[in-house]
From Swiss-Prot:
InterPro entries: Pra-immunoreactive (IPR051791), RDD (IPR010432). GO terms for cellular component: plasma membrane. This is Uncharacterized protein HI_1560. The keyword Cell membrane applies. It comes from the Bacteria. It is found in: Cell membrane. It comes from Haemophilus influenzae (strain ATCC 51907 / DSM 11121 / KW20 / Rd). The chain crosses the membrane at residues 46-66, 114-134. Keywords: Cell membrane, Membrane, Transmembrane, Transmembrane helix.
Amino acid sequence: MSFLTLKGNKMIIENQKDAEFSSAFKPSQLAQASRFKRWLASMINGLVLWVMAGLGFALGDFAGVVGMIVYAGFQLYFMKTYGQTMAKRWLGLRVFNYHTNQPVEFGKYIGREIIDILLAWTSFLLIISGIVALVRDDRRSLTDLVAGTIVLKDEK
């Protein structure tokens, strides 16, 4: 249900659900993640993958693939259970929907991670994504812009 309000000499049409959400919204819950913690989370996730796959491949190709699958399984478990990757959970970060300020749904999280993987295959675009996060005031990476997400501190 929408309603009309007057503010000064302007008429504003508001959606009641948006107004209820706005009044319940606490900005302190959505503080921006630091650039360093975002970078560190990426490095931790990459290091864990590198170690699991590297140890596996040291034992043979099949074991390397199993190591990568186990890593993906852990990440999927953390994303489904906690709404965070392992590193984001350890560092107190969470991915939110940029438009609703709500924690991102599992399916959207998976899509976001797939975008990151595709960018990683083209190292140049992954570097560009990091630079985008460095120069933007809201610290959103190219992945965030494409997926409609933002990484914030998890105040829970």
